[in-house]
């Protein structure tokens, strides 16, 4: 099993990409009739307790530089929403600064071949760059598969409760390639292969649960 090394040479991921996200209300049938305040209030555990799917809002994603959206980039010269936005993550969703999943709608283009844009804040990580550094190091290890990453400077304009608004600086995020069929194909592996999601990933001993196979209580 080998990664597609050439994939990491297509784009320069050493700098910072600027993204502009305008959020607005959608409709009940698509679960997008919510406020931006609601999106940032509830954690994954709150949704489980309420027994509802994670709230979403409509989003207009535009990519550019610090001067604004750029021609040729996704969302340029676009007025209508081209995406949906919701929180992502599990434990991290309890932080005040959320991680976001921005999913571009069908026929609304893609960004670097990706329609799902995962933006991670890493609020619990003081330096904010260790995750990207880890993926950058993985690129040099032939025996490991990696994911594409990019630092993102995010600006958000909230129109969910007002017809007017200004872009607010949300600071630095790390965009991490969403591991799905599109990513599997891009990395040169079987897009129909099986993906498994780990529900619990920790390094604690749990002596009352983790036992040797020779233990009678195994």
Regions found by a protein language model. Name each.
Residues 1-218:
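Phosphate/dinucleotide-binding and metal-coordinating scaffold of catalytic cores
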